[in-house]
Amino acid sequence: IEPLIRAGHTIFGENRVQEAHAKWPELRARYPEIELHLIGPLQRNKVSLALKVFDVIQTIDRLSLAKTVANHINKEKLKTKCFIQVNTGEEPQKSGVGPKDADAFISQCVFDLGLPVVGLMCIPPNDEEASLHFALLRQIADRNNLKELSMGMSADYSIAINFGATYVRIGSGIFGPRSDYHIT
């Protein structure tokens, strides 16, 4: 990670709250310009810890989580930004708000909860054309006046950029396949 930081890379994504909590505090003390994004699932019981570690939560995917995150952000006057995760493929095994429910969910998060939603995130199905899902996410973002789009990973990031991605997740393209890493 440090060679990338020294080369000028400042935005990093992490999938796991506890792993990030163990890894990043020392690095951030030395490199305060780092912006850290949670791009993996977030459990409500880890919200407090996540908000101490991350600048951006990209995986707001249900109302109970949105309420918990909003309560912490508002109570502690944090500057954390949030993305709504949209399950564009409506896959039952994946997290995210369904495309048909996205507008109402975004409105509820922003206007009822005061959640600082700045964008949307999606992970397209592996067996479908990614561009269809990126276009759908872009349409939802445009309807809701959201400027940030987190879409595209190592295999399809160039397509995502063509559809307006402002963040791409290319960890394995840079670091190689993820090895098992456990925090005890």
Each predicted region: which residue ranges?
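C-terminal helical cap(s) of enzyme catalytic domains, especially alpha/beta-barrels
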Residues: W24-Y31, S158-T184
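Conserved alpha/beta-domain cores
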Residues: I1-K147, M153-A155, I161-F163
